[in-house]
């Protein structure tokens, strides 16, 4: 698997990241893969994972990991994510889970509070990966 050239961008003239994400990520664009938003569905049962937002975020990240793998990619290829939360009070707990999946400079990211998500999910995450 070829590693893409990627550079985390930081400007002291903009606010520092308040979570596990980069202000920007610059890549030498190769093949782009757009991952649809994942919610905490167990792929074996297609039922929602039981538990709090931490359990849901863990399942969401594992679902993203599976889709990345099916594309021949991993989290090191992700350059952009959007996190949708039904309660921004869950921001720190979701960050803890999310941050464990990125070993290098994390991707650029936005987090948005929404009024509802499919099947009553508390969290949904989509991603863009480049190889």
From Swiss-Prot:
Q: Which GO terms describe its molecular function?
A: deaminase activity
| SUPFAM superfamilies, sorted | YjgF-like
InterPro entries named among the record's database cross-references: RidA, RidA_CS, RutC-like_sf, YjgF/YER057c/UK114
GO CC annotation terms, alphabetical: cytosol
Q: Which family does it belong to?
A: Belongs to the RutC family.
Q: Which NCBIfam families match?
A: Rid family detoxifying hydrolase (TIGR00004)
Q: What is this protein called?
A: Protein DfrA
Which organism is this entry from? Myxococcus xanthus
Give the organism's phylogenetic lineage: Bacteria, Pseudomonadati, Myxococcota, Myxococcia, Myxococcales
């Amino acid at each position: 698997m070829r590693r893409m050239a990627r550079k985390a961008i930081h400007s002291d003239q903009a606010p520092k990241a308040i979570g596990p994400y980069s202000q920007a990520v610059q890549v030498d664009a190769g093949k782009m893969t757009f991952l649809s938003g994942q919610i905490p569905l167990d792929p074996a049962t297609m039922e929602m994972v039981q538990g709090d937002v931490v359990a849901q975020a863990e399942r969401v990240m594992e679902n993203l990991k599976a889709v990345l793998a099916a594309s021949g990619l991993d989290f090191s290829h992700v350059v952009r994510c959007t996190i949708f939360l039904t309660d921004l009070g869950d921001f720190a707990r979701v960050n803890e889970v999310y941050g464990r999946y990125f070993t290098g400079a994390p991707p650029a990211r936005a987090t948005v509070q929404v009024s509802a998500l499919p099947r009553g999910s508390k969290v949904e995450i989509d991603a863009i990966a480049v190889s």
